[in-house]
């Protein structure tokens, strides 16, 4: 695993939750002795949905809802087996989606 990079992508609706999770991951990786790059904040995806308040008519009366998806990117350079084991045992809060990919340098 010496010439590989582990890329971790975090997604969540709450930015406080995602920042705390990224901090946990970075702290765990640094304890195992691997080099870490990040967290890099990626653009926030904002989805807006407009619905009518009334059932039949009154098209002028509308309501808008939005859902923001925050993303963070963490790269672990040359992860060791100890790093992979520590990350697999790490407990993350509900509401944080984690995607882990390994790639060659």
UniProtKB/Swiss-Prot annotation:
One of its GO terms (molecular function) is tRNA binding. InterPro entries: Ribosomal_uS10, Ribosomal_uS10_CS, Ribosomal_uS10_dom, Ribosomal_uS10_dom_sf. GO terms for biological process: translation. Keywords: Ribonucleoprotein, Ribosomal protein. GO terms for cellular component: ribonucleoprotein complex; ribosome. Transmembrane segments: none annotated. Involved in the binding of tRNA to the ribosomes. Part of the 30S ribosomal subunit. Belongs to the universal ribosomal protein uS10 family. This is Small ribosomal subunit protein uS10. It comes from Lachnoclostridium phytofermentans (strain ATCC 700394 / DSM 18823 / ISDg). The gene is rpsJ.
